[in-house]
Amino acid sequence: MLTFIGLGLYDERSISIAGRDALQAADYVAAEFYTSYLVDATVSDLETAHDIDIDVRDREGVEQHPEDILRKAQSEDVAFLTAGDTMISTTHTDLRLRAIDRGIDTRVIHGVTAQTAASGLTGLQNYRFGKSVTLPFPYAHGAEGVPTSVTDSIAANRERGLHTVVYLDIKANRDEYLRASDAAEMLATDLEDMLAIAVARAGSPDPTVRADRLSALAEKDFGDPLHLLVLPGELHHLEEEALAALADAPADMLNAVDSQ
């Protein structure tokens, strides 16, 4: 059996009860934290809290050389962990399909994701979001500015009146995390100076949610990572009220969105 378990967003307690039970019953536990990580828990914290040993895999060890994971899963109960949800954004469908091809039973125990948390924290309605994008560090995509794939997706969403979640690049092996202020500065240069919402530490006891024009967000300090940005499309009146109450959105910026 190969069980995919989402750990949620914040610490060793963010996992669901079903996930915790499956984790503690596993004979072997593997995890990856190269695409996301828990804001307030180390691997050691997870191991201590759940009385387990975790084999942390790099990207190559998951995507190119998962044979030992699959071999173990043919005769043992194996758990595979990620922050958030293993099948949303950080998708491991390929690993699941490889297991199924070998006749291995699989299941998924879901965790809270950054996108659902961002919707809840901002008050923006979940069904009004379009395609999400990831904004890389400039050095990571080998060119100046924002990749056209990012700006094109944002523009396409806005044409349809949809909101965009902008995930921010993570280089966990280098302890580098793109911050909302730096991302806002990059986007303000390549896009119009539009309304945006910075969300920091979603899932924690002290998340930060602030709405303003991109140039204003670029001047703010949102504290420790992880951060993301939301670029709103057309706003329902309840969404406007939520952004004003939950994210201190300036009234003139909400009016500007209405007039687009």
Curated annotation (Swiss-Prot):
Origin superkingdom: Archaea
Reactions that this protein is recorded to catalyse: 2-[(3S)-amino-3-carboxypropyl]-L-histidyl-[translation elongation factor 2] + 3 S-adenosyl-L-methionine = diphthine-[translation elongation factor 2] + 3 S-adenosyl-L-homocysteine + 3 H(+)
InterPro entries in the record: 4pyrrol_Mease, 4pyrrol_Methylase_sf, 4pyrrole_Mease_sub1, 4pyrrole_Mease_sub2, Dphthn_synthase
E.C. designation(s): 2.1.1.98
Coiled-coil regions, chain positions: none
GO molecular function, one term: diphthine synthase activity
Chain sites annotated for binding S-adenosyl-L-methionine: 9, 85, 88, 113-114, 168, 202, 227
Alphabetic keyword roster: Methyltransferase, S-adenosyl-L-methionine, Transferase
Broad enzyme group: transferase
One Pfam short name: TP_methylase
A Gene Ontology BP annotation from the UniProt entry: methylation
SUPFAM superfamilies named among the record's database cross-references: Tetrapyrrole methylase
Pathway: Protein modification; peptidyl-diphthamide biosynthesis
Family membership: Belongs to the diphthine synthase family.
Alphabetical list of PANTHER family matching this protein: DIPHTHINE METHYL ESTER SYNTHASE, DIPHTHINE SYNTHASE
Record note on quaternary structure: Homodimer.
Biological role: S-adenosyl-L-methionine-dependent methyltransferase that catalyzes the trimethylation of the amino group of the modified target histidine residue in translation elongation factor 2 (EF-2), to form an intermediate called diphthine. The three successive methylation reactions represent the second step of diphthamide biosynthesis.
Protein name stated in the entry: Diphthine synthase
Organism annotation: Haloquadratum walsbyi (strain DSM 16790 / HBSQ001)
